[in-house]
Design a protein with these regions (language model features):
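Surface-exposed, low-complexity loop segments enriched in small/polar and acidic residues
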Residues: 1-269
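Structured alpha-helical segments in the cores of large, soluble enzyme domains
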Residues: 62, 268-281
């Protein structure tokens, strides 16, 4: 089994009204009142990571010999490296909402939030430990969709590949990150010799001199969901960072709950050099 998303969810709560509960586990549910479930996420999508890289480089040079003993070289180098990476990630609020499945009036599995948009869903240990719900094991905040709008697709966690394609599509999202690195280099070099002071030196005076200008920049743009930006369809205000809604939360695509940022930078430098050769000794 291959999946780009490899991880596991620990201490997921299965409630007694979950219609996907296997009959073999019903006696345990009747005795305890709930189940604690651990699940690897290997069968929730089959999307691999994709990387597209493109390098463009233009180099030009010119050599000029103003006289027999002097040469001037000019060179310019312009390069751009672009990378686009795509990977699939689980959206935590959607996953927990899809896991919190009940039966509707006709006995069909549905998300609890479709019947009660104010319902709080249970989260697992890792999300709790990293402050997903501000300290509790339940959350009533839906960040990437609006509960009750019919989007939520119930997820069957029991068995390999038990989750329906609709549930897989609902709980996952394709994320795109883009990186661009640009470089510009310009240099001029002159070398030659002067046949002077012949009575004092054992040959002509040689020289080499030059100047180089270098400008480099990079720009790394993360997917808005990776940045914790609330998407269209959220039950809150789209386009704002999730921490403005829940101050304890910075993202909803991983357990880390670490705020991510776009990064960029640039620098330029100018180097000048000069050398001289004096043939003092024969």
């Amino acid at each position: 089994t291959y999946s780009a998303y490899d991880g596991f969810f620990d201490t997921l709560e299965i409630t007694p009204d979950n219609p996907y509960l296997p009959t073999e586990l019903q006696p345990v549910m009747d005795q305890v009142g709930y189940l604690i479930f651990t699940k690897d996420a290997l069968d929730w999508h089959e999307d691999g990571s994709e990387y597209t890289r493109e390098t463009t480089r233009v180099v030009a040079g010119l050599e000029w010999q103003p006289s027999e003993d002097h040469v001037v070289e000019f060179a310019v180098n312009q390069g751009i490296f672009e990378q686009k990476s795509e990977s699939t990630s689980i959206l935590l609020d959607r996953f927990y909402a899809a896991m919190d499945t009940v039966a509707d009036a006709n006995g069909n599995p549905v998300c609890r939030s479709d019947l009660d948009p104010t319902a709080a869903y249970p989260i697992d240990y890792f999300a709790w430990a990293n402050g997903y719900s501000g300290g509790g094991f339940y959350s009533d905040r839906y960040y990437t969709f609006t509960p009750g709008d019919g989007q939520c697709q119930p997820l069957n966690p029991f068995g390999t590949y038990a989750a329906s394609p609709e549930a897989q599509d609902f709980i996952t999202e394709r994320l795109t990150n883009e990186l661009e690195v640009e470089q510009f280099v310009l240099n001029i070099t002159a070398v030659g010799s002067f046949d002077v002071l012949g009575g004092l030196l054992d040959g002509p005076i040689g020289y080499a001199a030059g100047i180089e200008y270098r400008d480099e920049s990079s720009d790394n743009q993360l997917d808005p969901l990776t940045l914790g930006i609330l998407p269209a369809g959220t039950s809150f205000t789209p386009g704002v960072q999730v921490s403005e809604v829940s101050p304890w939360l910075f993202g909803f695509t991983s357990f880390d709950n670490t705020q991510q940022f776009n990064t960029s930078g640039d620098y330029d430098v100018t180097d000048v050099f000069a050398e001289i050769r004096l043939p003092i000794f024969a």
